[in-house]
């Protein structure tokens, strides 16, 4: 039987990630949406733009090759941007992880490119584990920012961290 352990990024605490994070060199407005899509953003670009306008938020899209300033964001800066964002819009597993760790509002979008539909299983499993399925964008719920039960998330995270560390320590001995 295969043992399921947490993704390594979840084994570190928020305080440990804060020691790693770094504020970007470029100027960041006080309120912004962090957009991080590994797949094509085209399917959702208009929804996100309209959300930003309605909520008077800057958009920081860190995986847009046309925006060199933000495209060159380092991993340390990425972590800082997640922690300080008003909301995160993403299709990335790890952007979801950091949103969860920092208790941030986020919406996760399914990739629509052919061949990538099944990549969502990992994200869905993560969200189900922490009862965060309502954070999945369903086509018309972009304005529904769910109030997550972060106490529940932290309780489950602590249990899973302990189980994962026990397994890894035993496996390495």
PLM segments and residue spans:
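Active-site anion-handling motifs in enzyme catalytic cores
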Residues: 1-173
């Amino acid at each position: 039987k295969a043992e399921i352990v947490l993704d390594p990024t979840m084994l570190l605490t928020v305080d440990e990630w804060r020691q790693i994070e770094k504020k970007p060199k470029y100027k960041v407005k006080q309120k912004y949406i962090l957009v991080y899509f590994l797949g094509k953003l085209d399917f959702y670009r208009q929804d996100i733009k309209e959300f930003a306008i309605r909520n008077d938020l800057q958009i920081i899209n860190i995986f847009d090759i046309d925006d060199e300033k933000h495209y060159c964001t380092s991993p340390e800066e990425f972590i800082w941007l997640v922690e300080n964002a008003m909301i995160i819009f993403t299709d990335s597993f790890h952007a979801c992880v950091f949103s969860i760790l920092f208790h941030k509002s986020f919406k996760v979008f399914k990739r629509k490119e052919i061949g990538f539909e099944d990549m969502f299983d990992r994200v869905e499993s993560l969200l189900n584990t922490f009862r965060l399925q309502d954070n999945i964008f369903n086509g018309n719920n972009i304005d529904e920012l769910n109030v997550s039960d972060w106490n529940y998330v932290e309780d489950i995270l602590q249990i899973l961290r302990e189980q994962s560390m026990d397994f890894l320590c035993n496996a390495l001995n």
